[in-house]
C-alpha cells in the first residue's frame, strides 16, 4: 500500500476521527504519494529565494509527489507558505540524521559546497540529480542535466559569459524538469504585512500619496563589486529628492551601516529613512513589499523584490545579466 499524505505514523489521522474509517485505502480521503522527492538547497539566501520557482515546476511534473526541502534555518521563512512544498527541514545534525534513514525516489541537490554534496551522497534515493561529492573532495555532476551548469561554472570568461539561460532555466535543467516561466515566490501573511505597513507609515508620517524608493546599497562579502558606488547613490538620492512626494528608504546589513549613514547625512533630508540593520529577514520582506520601486544590485533584495512582484531598477557587476530574469519588472 502506498503511503497516504494524511498518515501520521504514531497516531490516527484526522479522518479517522471524522469518519471512523480504519481501512485507509477504502476511505474517500485516501490520497497517497506516488513519488518522494528531496531538494537540498542551503545557500545563499538569494539563491534559495530564486530557487522557489522549482517547487511549482516539480509539482507540475510530479503532481502526486511529496516534496521535502532542506535549507538553512535563516532561509526557512522563504519556503514557508509555499503550497508546492510539503515538508521543510532546517539544516542541522538532527535533520541530517533523520533524512539518512529515509529513502527518496528523487534527490535533487542544487549546491556545490561540501556540506550539501556530502549529504547528497549519504542520503538514499533511486535517482540523483544535481551535485554530489567526489571521493577526492570536489563537487561533481550526478546527472546529464547538471553537466552544462557544472562546465559553465568552471569557465567564467568563456561559457559563463556566453550562457543565455537564466538561473531558473539552469536549475530546471539540473532537475530534469521542463521550464515554463515559473516565477520565484514568497508568501507574506496578509494581516502581518498590513500591520507592518500601517505601523511604518504611521511612524514616519507617510501617506499613500508618497512614492517610496527602497535603496539596498550593499551586497554580500564574496562579490563586493556587486554594489554600486557610494557617490553614485548620493547623486541618485539627490535627484530623487527633487520630487517632494518621494520617500527614500536605505537598507543594508552591518556592512552598510557607515555607507548608509554617509548617504543619509550628505542630503540632510527628513525624507530619507535609514533602516540599516533594523529588521529581521521577514520584516525586510514586508519593507520591500510596501515600497513602490526597489533599487538594488544582484543581492537577496533583488530576488525578494522579484518574488513580491515589485518594480525594480537593478545593476550588475560580476554577475552575467542574462542569468537574472526580472520577469518584466525592471
Feature names for model-found ranges:
Residues 1-330:
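Catalytic machinery of carbohydrate-active enzymes
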Amino acid at each position: 500500500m502506498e503511503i497516504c499524505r494524511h498518515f501520521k505514523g504514531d497516531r490516527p489521522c484526522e479522518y479517522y476521527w471524522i469518519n471512523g474509517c480504519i481501512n485507509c485505502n477504502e476511505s474517500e480521503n485516501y490520497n497517497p504519494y506516488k513519488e518522494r522527492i528531496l531538494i537540498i538547497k542551503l545557500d545563499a539566501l538569494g539563491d534559495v529565494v530564486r530557487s522557489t520557482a522549482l517547487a511549482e515546476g516539480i509539482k507540475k511534473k510530479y503532481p502526486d509527489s511529496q516534496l521535502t526541502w532542506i535549507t538553512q534555518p535563516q532561509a526557512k521563512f522563504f519556503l514557508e507558505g509555499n503550497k508546492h512544498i510539503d515538508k521543510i527541514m532546517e539544516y542541522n545534525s538532527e535533520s541530517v540524521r533523520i533524512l539518512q534513514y529515509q529513502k527518496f525516489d528523487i534527490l535533487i541537490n542544487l549546491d556545490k559546497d561540501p556540506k550539501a554534496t556530502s549529504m547528497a551522497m549519504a542520503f538514499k534515493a533511486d535517482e540523483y540529480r544535481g551535485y554530489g561529492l567526489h571521493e577526492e573532495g570536489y563537487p561533481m555532476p550526478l546527472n546529464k542535466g547538471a553537466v552544462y551548469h557544472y562546465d559553465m561554472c568552471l569557465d567564467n570568461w568563456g561559457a559563463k559569459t556566453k550562457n543565455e539561460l537564466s538561473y531558473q532555466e539552469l536549475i530546471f535543467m539540473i532537475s530534469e524538469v521542463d521550464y515554463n516561466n515559473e516565477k520565484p515566490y514568497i508568501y507574506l501573511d496578509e494581516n502581518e504585512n498590513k500591520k507592518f505597513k500601517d505601523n511604518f507609515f504611521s511612524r514616519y508620517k507617510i501617506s499613500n500619496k508618497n512614492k517610496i524608493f527602497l535603496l539596498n546599497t550593499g551586497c554580500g562579502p564574496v562579490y563586493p563589486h556587486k554594489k554600486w558606488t557610494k557617490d553614485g547613490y548620493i547623486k541618485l538620492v539627490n535627484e530623487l529628492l527633487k520630487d517632494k512626494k518621494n520617500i527614500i528608504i536605505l537598507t543594508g546589513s552591518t556592512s552598510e551601516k557607515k555607507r548608509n549613514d554617509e548617504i543619509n547625512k550628505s542630503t540632510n533630508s527628513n525624507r530619507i529613512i535609514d533602516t540599516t540593520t533594523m529588521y529581521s529577514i521577514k520584516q525586510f520582506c514586508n519593507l520591500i513589499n510596501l515600497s513602490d520601486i526597489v533599487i538594488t544590485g544582484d543581492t537577496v533584495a533583488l530576488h525578494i523584490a522579484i518574488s513580491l512582484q515589485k518594480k525594480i531598477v537593478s545593476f550588475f557587476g560580476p554577475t552575467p545579466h542574462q542569468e537574472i530574469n526580472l520577469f518584466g519588472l525592471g
